[in-house]
């Protein structure tokens, strides 16, 4: 892998060096052709020895320059220049043709991007002062889509009549409802009371000592326990009847029923029979 990478790098740099050499040769050829054109232009004046200079520089018309006469100047000079210029230009064009094609191929293969350096040191920056109205106007001009949506589509001339352009009447906002909050009663600090106990006011009654011998406060499971009347028992007797012994009521009811049966004269018929027997006897 290392050898292949080195070969690829060597090939890359070799191609780059070839490209630079070809660019230098093409620049030299262009400079030579430019110099030949300038010398030909200088020797085209009539009456001065232009043919001699042109023949010496081009190398093609040396014989023409030596055989020309100084007296006639205009015709010989023009003939020498035209011949020299034609040969030199055609020769330069022929030599520059294949080199130009090779350069274009290399440029297509390797394109080097040279960033252009721009000097901004001479710029003078000033503080921008733009009002808000101008900003809004510029935004409206730059964003026609927003105006299209807000205005219902385009300008007034572009609007078309139809059911889709009917604007709904603007409804007035409802009046704000004022909610009156009832102030909560002041709570005593340090004591928590549930909501149910906050509203009810309880009066504290004087509470005496507990009645130890009362069955209501201290009920006993013994059937032979003595019942001691207390103040609460007396108060309860005033309102309703207190049943102290479960069998007493039944005994009283049975006695009453027995008395009622005894009060009935069940032997009245027998007594009449006795009286009748006594009479017959």
UniProtKB/Swiss-Prot annotation:
GO cellular component: cytoplasm; cytosol; plasma membrane
Pfam families, A to Z: CDV3 (PF15359)
Keywords annotated in UniProt: Acetylation, Cytoplasm, Phosphoprotein
Residues modified to Phosphoserine: 8, 131, 155
Subcellular compartments: Cytoplasm
Known tissue expression: Ubiquitously expressed (at protein level). Up-regulated in ventricles of juvenile visceral steatosis mice.
Name the UniProt record assigns to this protein: Protein CDV3
Organism: Mus musculus (Mouse)
Keyword Nucleotide-binding: no
Post-translational modification, as annotated: Isoform 1 and isoform 2 are phosphorylated on tyrosines by ABL1 in B-cells.
Positions with biased composition (Low complexity): 27-45, 157-170
Residues where Phosphothreonine is found: 4, 205
Biased composition (Polar residues): 214-225
Modified residues (N-acetylalanine): 2
Extent of Basic and acidic residues compositional bias: 1-15, 103-119, 226-254
